[in-house]
Amino acid sequence: MKLLAVRRLFRIQRVVIRYRLDDLLFDLPLPWWLRSLRLLMPWRWLPRTPSELSRGARLRLALQDLGPIFIKFGQLLSTRRDLLPTDIADELMLLQDRVPPFDPKQAVALIESQLGAKVGEVFSRFDVEPLASASVAQVHAARLKTGEEVVVKVVRPGLKPVIAQDLAWLFLIAKGAERASADARRLHPVEIVGDYEKTIYDELDLLREAANASQLRRNFEGSELMYVPQVYWDLCRPKVLVMERIYGVPVTDMATLADQRTDMKLLAERGVEVFFTQVFRHSFFHADMHPGNIFVSTVKPWSPQYIAIDCGIVGSLTAEDQDYLARNLIAFFKRDYRRVAELHIDSGWVPAHTKVNEFEAAIRTVCEPIFEKPLKDISFGQVLMRLFQTARRFNMEVQPQLVLLQKTLLNIEGLGRQLYPDLDLWSTAKPFLERWMRERYSPKAMFGNLYSQAEQLPHLAGMTRDLLERLSQPHLHDPQLPERRRQGDRWALRLLGAGLLGGGAVLAASAAEAASLAAPAAWPAWLMLAAGLYLIVRQ
């Protein structure tokens, strides 16, 4: 293992030299003692032809040379436009996760070991030639004994040791960068590698992908917007996934879509509707909707339907995040930058001590040039990206789900404009968001919310005791405490206030039946109502 690690180190070094990534490194404002290390690098004393490639292109080619794990890491980096320079992020978007297929005999052996049966006993036909091959898995076509056409996804064998080794080097590079450069620390490289570690290991578990696909299929059951293939759960294992095979037109095949007279305007608008439906209706969204994972049904070209595959990466938002995101978008397009700043602070996305006036001015400076364009030319994804970049300057904590959401929105938006260049996202999204906000704050929704909070009443005594114990500890009031913990305390106090209000209302109703609310027996109800109201207003 140590020998393999040393060989991998030399491989990384060769790639760094070949693509002159050391030039990029020493262009950073490093400490003098690190900059002096260039004198110890023998290849820097040799004449080298200046590279005609941009820095982004050199980084992309280097990641491609280092193999699939580094390629996928580059793809993850390309979604972090709130952190990376635009030229580098654009180049990394070009990375393709395509690797040669592994031996079909290995695929068959793995399927048989996972299913505990011979391939011929499970499938009436199994194509040994794969349909597609990527860094984590490859896909084979097959037919079940019952006649259904399916695809079989198989995890690439021997992948975990390779991933562990490459992740170790990525962590080492990230930690070194954080120690060496203040600019690097601002990018949180160790945190980014940590996110990637979770993502790549999640993709190795095909049962997780199967569960995601089942959830998405259930969410869009009977919908004309999107179709998700059926999962055959009895044939799914951690390293094997069997799904319905779909036959559709790749969403980038414009010629075929045009030949079958697909309504391109409606198709583009439905893409936007799919995104907002997932985010705001379902709070569960496909977070890898690049063109390779999206097809179009050929059944009704006048009412086109999307088909989504590869549900390995998904995202979700809390009810609070949904609310703040919707309010942010509406405030943005009204150019109400102060409201945007206030929402960020209220949500806890930026620290509570942030000066609203300064934050508002920064948002205005960045966003006003965007809104000088016609609405149909404004990029939703660019708006979110600029917002995140600005908020990072005010110490906004990284919100992984919002990063996934921004990446998904950029994919959907780019796809929609490719299908129909005059797509006006705002005219499609605005009615959806306004309708969602009305429904969210309708009397029916408010009553449902009150009912769900009332379910916490049996736990009120324990919650009160725990909260009082925490508040009695002086160090919890230390202003240096993480903002997230203090935000949690505020939400806990709000919940406690709601519980006291609910309990007081129940006691008041009981007292009203027995006697008068002015009677001595009603004082606990009044006390609980007053305390609950105070906590909610105070917070």
Curated annotation (Swiss-Prot):
Fetch the InterPro entries from UniProt. Answer: ABC1_dom, Kinase-like_dom_sf, UbiB, UbiB_bact, UbiB_kinase
Task: State the membrane topology.
Answer: Multi-pass membrane protein
List, from the UniProt record, the residues annotated as the active site of this protein. Answer: D288 (proton acceptor)
Residue stretches making up the Protein kinase domain: 125-493
Q: Where in the cell is the protein located? A: Cell inner membrane
Q: Which GO terms describe its molecular function?
A: ATP binding; protein kinase activity
* Enzyme Commission no: 2.7.-.-
Q: What class of enzyme is it?
A: transferase
Q: Which GO terms describe its biological process?
A: regulation of ubiquinone biosynthetic process; ubiquinone biosynthetic process
Question: Which keywords does the record carry?
Answer: ATP-binding, Cell inner membrane, Cell membrane, Kinase, Membrane, Nucleotide-binding, Transferase, Transmembrane, Transmembrane helix, Ubiquinone biosynthesis
Q: Where does ATP bind?
A: L131, A132, S133, A134, S135, V136, A137, Q138, V139, K153
Identify the metabolic or biological route this protein is part of.
Answer: Cofactor biosynthesis; ubiquinone biosynthesis [regulation]
Q: Where are the transmembrane segments?
A: 495-515, 517-537
Return the GO cellular component terms, semicolon-separated.
plasma membrane
Superkingdom of the organism of origin:
Bacteria
| Pfam families, sorted | ABC1 (PF03109)
Per its database record, what is this protein's job? Is probably a protein kinase regulator of UbiI activity which is involved in aerobic coenzyme Q (ubiquinone) biosynthesis.
**Family that this chain belongs to:** Belongs to the ABC1 family. UbiB subfamily.
Stated name of the protein: Probable protein kinase UbiB
Gene that produces this protein: ubiB
